């Protein structure tokens, strides 16, 4: 009898594993939203908690308020603000991880300079990470991993990007054997073409993409007008060069890409940006942007010992691989993986912050997972706010937890994004309630 039960249990586990391996991009089955069954876990002294987070406004690359501001200055602004807000001595930090995509060496030198500009002593170590568009979230995962393995009890996870001042589109030195592998060759497909591939392969119409983009703009405009971003944004005073080359001092205090006057008619007039007859336009794609964000994490016991606030708890993190030529579908596979690790379903989540690299891929992921539209990016996403590559993941964490705090009740939220070359990342956070 016990042998039969053991075989049944083993078969069940095998079916679960096969279920995760199935449902890849070729499958048409969607993740079904199960009835809400969330039970909040007991607080543990070993929990990795988010203490606090801040971000800069997001500037329009090449023409906005940060077009002449170096990334070390953007990063220093948020590092300084987070430490000052919670009155934490900088020498208490066990490590700093900074996500960056476009700077040489993932911005390792730039980030260390920013550390010193922020008054953080040389005794605090720092590393840089580049997992493309998930770099900011990967920094969060890296710091959380260090806390979990006992390397330290408190650390700072950041993301930063100056797309104004960085060289985009150069893959670096690569093998002459590239043509021998379809997947290797697909890693060089322009991101806009991967968006077109998703739209064509999964039937995401131009009208649906434009409607999604309009909703993003409308939500962001509403949030901005209500002051919803005020608590998370660090105003940055900087200098900008005018058309004559003269320096002017300005203070950037809100996101520059939000366009309240956006209409479906206006979006419909935009030409395809990446190929003739395509459906991906400047209006239904993320904006090229500048910005930085920082998130302070700690072991719960250390946060309590230091009298620090607890804004959220990191419950799970997952990264998955998908075909490079349709890289935008990554969240559709990363989110279920992260939810499973947390023991949750789609219905248990109040807010999904899914990066809007392109409306095509964001829509695909939302529809594939059966996520109610009202749960997706309630304050707008990258189409309206902008997408400073290395910053985005950290920015999403800050925005998510601040919005859950505004709502007040205990709840779960998800941060997710697609990743160039074919990946997706997702993390589940719990807001503990007011």
Curated annotation (Swiss-Prot):
GO terms for molecular function: acetate CoA-transferase activity; acetyl-CoA C-acetyltransferase activity; acetyl-CoA C-acyltransferase activity; acetyl-CoA C-myristoyltransferase activity; palmitoyl-CoA oxidase activity. GO terms for cellular component: cytosol; peroxisome. Induction: Peroxisomal thiolase is markedly induced (at the level of transcription) by various hypolipidemic compounds in parallel with the other two enzymes of the peroxisomal beta-oxidation system. It catalyses: an acyl-CoA + acetyl-CoA = a 3-oxoacyl-CoA + CoA; 2 acetyl-CoA = acetoacetyl-CoA + CoA; tetradecanoyl-CoA + acetyl-CoA = 3-oxohexadecanoyl-CoA + CoA; hexanoyl-CoA + acetyl-CoA = 3-oxooctanoyl-CoA + CoA. It is found in: Peroxisome. One of its GO terms (biological process) is bile acid metabolic process. Its EC number is 2.3.1.16, 2.3.1.155, 2.3.1.9. Residues 11-36 are annotated as: PTS2-type peroxisomal targeting signal. It holds the Pfam family Thiolase_C. Keywords: Acetylation, Acyltransferase, Fatty acid metabolism, Lipid metabolism, Peroxisome, Transferase, Transit peptide. Belongs to the thiolase-like superfamily. Thiolase family. This is 3-ketoacyl-CoA thiolase A, peroxisomal. The lineage of its organism: Eukaryota, Metazoa, Chordata, Craniata, Vertebrata.
